[in-house]
Amino acid sequence: GLFIRMDFVPVQMTIDGTQVSITSGYTDTSFSTDEILDLQLLDSLPDDSFVRSNGSADGHQLLGVFRGKKTGPCRMYVELDESPVLSIQTDEYTVFLTAPTKIQAENWYQELKDHMFDN
């Protein structure tokens, strides 16, 4: 677990007003909290076959733009050995996101949830 690839930048999520930004060293995504249709904290990625259209999948992490057979278009920021997985469904795509710690993931979930119901 001590081996860290130099290219891995921890994913960050920030919420500024209604604007949610997810940044990583590879690709960034932003959307408005108004666009969130569904928000879940999952134990792992859904059982689906995901095809990469623009991104990186090295067996440890999925990063970038993917399409799931059932899920449809998605944005992945997932370390495969991290749990839980935050699933944020917008009208355009679903974002899957893991955090470095379980607590961080739960905080992000709570923060998004609070913003969703502010509107």
Regions found by a protein language model. Name each.
Residues 2-33, 40:
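Conserved beta-hairpin
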Residues 1-2, 107:
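An N-terminal domain-start capping segment
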Residues 5, 69-70, 102, 113:
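Context-gated lysine
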Residues 34, 45, 79-119:
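Terminal and domain-flanking low-complexity segments
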Residues 23-30, 38-91:
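Non-transmembrane, membrane-adjacent beta-strand/coil modules in membrane-associated proteins
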